[in-house]
Amino acid sequence: MGEKWKRQQKLCNVPHIPRIRVPRSASDTPLLKDLTQGQQRYFYSIMRIYSPRPQWEALQARYLHSLQHQQLLGYITQREASACAAVLRDSTKRASAKAGPHRTVPQRAAGRTRTQPSARPVCVIPLRARSTRLPSLRSRAVHKL
């Protein structure tokens, strides 16, 4: 019984390796048919390195942080920040739903390729009237004259 506990304890410390998501357009190409499974995994790992998804997630996080910062400074209201964040979340959900479920390396079946590009979230922050906190350079120059 002690051996089983030690074995389970060792498994908890093993780092989790994320699965490689393979788009249908890449998995169904005739070029990959002649490759072995190891070569395909290597190719998919290279595809993962050049994947735009981590950059896209970082951009989303940066945008949300920017919204929070603008709200703290008083440039936008809580309602405006929440509305823009909701638009970002909804458009991200729509884009991931449009792309369909991603397949992993072990699965291999014929499928169709996607014909439409995935949607990118768009949120326009409405400009508010000038803030009373930060006067513009133009108003400073007028006061000096």
Curated annotation (Swiss-Prot):
A UniProt-annotated Pfam family: FAM216B
InterPro entries associated with the record: FAM216 (IPR029373)
Annotated region described as Disordered, given as residue ranges: 92-121
Family label: Belongs to the FAM216 family.
Name of the protein: Protein FAM216B
Natural source organism: Bos taurus
Gene assigned in the entry: FAM216B
